[in-house]
UniProtKB/Swiss-Prot annotation:
Disulfide bridge partners, by residue number: none
Enzyme class: hydrolase
A GO biological-process term: DNA catabolic process
UniProt protein name: Exodeoxyribonuclease 7 large subunit
Gene name of this polypeptide: xseA
MF GO annotations: exodeoxyribonuclease VII activity; nucleic acid binding
Entry-linked HAMAP family: Exonuc_7_L
InterPro entries (alphabetical): Exonuc_VII_L (IPR003753), Exonuc_VII_lsu_C (IPR020579), OB-fold_nuc-bd_dom (IPR025824)
Length: 448
């Protein structure tokens, strides 16, 4: 066997070239697997093995990376990781250097996130040359968020502290759950239809990847991109990143940071105003000097012309302008006076005193009608009672007695209308028109 003289590798050289090949060709990869042999030494680094049913690979996640992981990994847990293939040269072991780690459930969402991110980037929605500049002097901010969440309280607190002069218009929307993305799109479209603010602040507090998923909507990305108003995305905490952050004109890490970005400190604003006033005074001074020079030149030219004639023309023009100004002022004052009278009439009509007078008259009218109706009802009732009394009197037994008849009852006060009801010796009572008569039956005659 012939040994080559110039192509003999050392172990270190071989491991180094293998490392360069793996890192250069594979780059970053996503890997799904089960954690085993997890260890977290005092250095702060994590070491673990990812495995499936057939294979396994050693992994390392250094302290600077694992501090952003929101959970503590445990053996047997399914995770989705992103990292770079490398070779640990001292042992010749190839391994995965993990950059980010998510639970397997969040991992599926992360894959969808990356796929949508690549798609929208290819469409140019993240291009830097499409980003709009924020207005320099923001007077009114439109906040798109939940009106009851912590984010709006943070935003209002920061604005009140830094620049109370900024007005805030809240476009209430759902910021979590089903159809939240379409709800946010509708709020952005409403703001663009009204065009009543200088800039939009899309914001909510922190949460899990699933909680913030509505901000990773393709429809929302296109709505933000097509917005005529500049959009600042301030969603979640500093470690959270959403599609809305990439497509918005500016990204702020938190709601409070978004409010600070869109406001100026009161002291800085006063200093800036003083600078503007100073520049304005300088401009006015320069303008005055310029006009004085121009006036001097005109005076010199005027001396070469007929001063009296020129003056007469100026006086005539001045008179015309004065008349036009007086007419305009008169018309304006007349219009204002008429408008004032109209407003006074409308105010009088809307005055509580006027309404009270109308209601008082109406109440008096209703009271009169009620009293008349009660009197009519009382009169009708009296007439019916009188008629009924007359009818009762007509059929009353007492009325029969007044015509000369009598009523006879036995000892039990039973009315006797047949002689067969009595026997000789019975006691009977006869009621006349005036008084009663008690009798004893001595004879009974049957006249039937």
């Amino acid at each position: 066997m012939q040994v080559p003289k110039n192509n003999i590798y050392t172990v270190s050289r071989l491991n180094g070239e293998v490392r360069q090949i793996l890192e250069g060709q594979l780059g970053k990869v996503w890997l799904n697997g089960e954690i085993s042999n997890f260890s977290a030494p005092s250095s702060g680094h994590w070491y673990l093995t990812l495995k499936d049913h057939y294979s396994q690979i050693r992994c390392a996640m250094f302290k600077g990376r694992n501090q952003s992981v929101s959970f503590k990994p445990v053996n047997g847990q399914q995770v989705l990781v992103k990292g770079a293939i490398s070779v640990y040269e001292p042992r010749g072991d190839y391994q995965l250097l993990i950059e980010s780690m998510l639970p397997a459930g969040d991992g599926l969402l992360a894959q969808q996130f990356e796929a949508l991110k690549m798609k929208l980037a290819a469409q140019g929605l993240f291009a830097a040359d499409t980003k709009r500049q924020l207005p320099k002097n923001i007077q009114r901010i439109g906040v798109i968020t939940s009106p009851t969440g912590a984010a709006i309280r943070d935003v209002l607190h920061v604005l009140a502290r830094r620049d109370p002069s900024i007005e805030v218009i809240i476009y209430p929307t759902q910021v979590q759950g089903e159809n939240a993305d379409m709800n946010i799109c509708q709020a952005i479209n409403i703001a663009n239809q009204r065009l009543e603010v200088d800039v939009l602040l899309l914001t909510r507090g922190g949460g899990s990847l699933e909680d913030l998923w509505c901000f990773n909507s393709e429809a929302l990305a296109h709505t933000i991109y097509n917005s005529a108003l500049p959009v600042v995305s301030a969603v979640g905490h500093e470690v959270d990143t959403t599609i809305s952050d990439y497509v918005a004109d500016v990204r702020a890490p938190t709601p409070s940071a978004g409010a600070e970005l869109l406001s100026q400190d009161s002291d800085n604003k006063s200093q800036r105003l003083a600078t503007v006033l100073s520049r304005l005074k300088q401009s006015a001074s320069h303008y005055q000097l310029k006009q004085e020079k121009r006036l001097s030149l005109l005076e010199h030219r005027l001396q070469r012309l007929d001063p009296k004639r020129t003056l007469q023309q100026f006086e005539q023009r001045f008179d015309e302008m004065q008349l036009r100004l007086e007419a305009a002022l008169s018309n304006k004052l007349h219009g204002l006076s008429r408008r004032q009278q109209q407003l006074a009439n409308r105010l009088e009509q809307q005055s509580p005193k006027h309404k009270l007078a109308l209601e008082t008259n109406r109440l008096s009218y209703l009271a009169t009608r009620l009293q008349d109706a009660m009197q009519d009802t009382l009169n009708q009732s009296e007439q019916r009672i009188t008629y009924a009394a007359h009818q009762l009197e007509t059929v009353s037994p007492l009325a029969t007695l007044s015509r000369g008849y009598s009523i006879t009852t036995d000892a039990n006060n039973q009315v006797i209308d047949n002689a067969a009801q009595l026997s000789v010796g019975d006691k009977i009572n006869t009621r006349l028109r005036h008084g009663q008569v008690q009798s004893t039956v001595t004879q009974i005659t049957d006249e039937s």
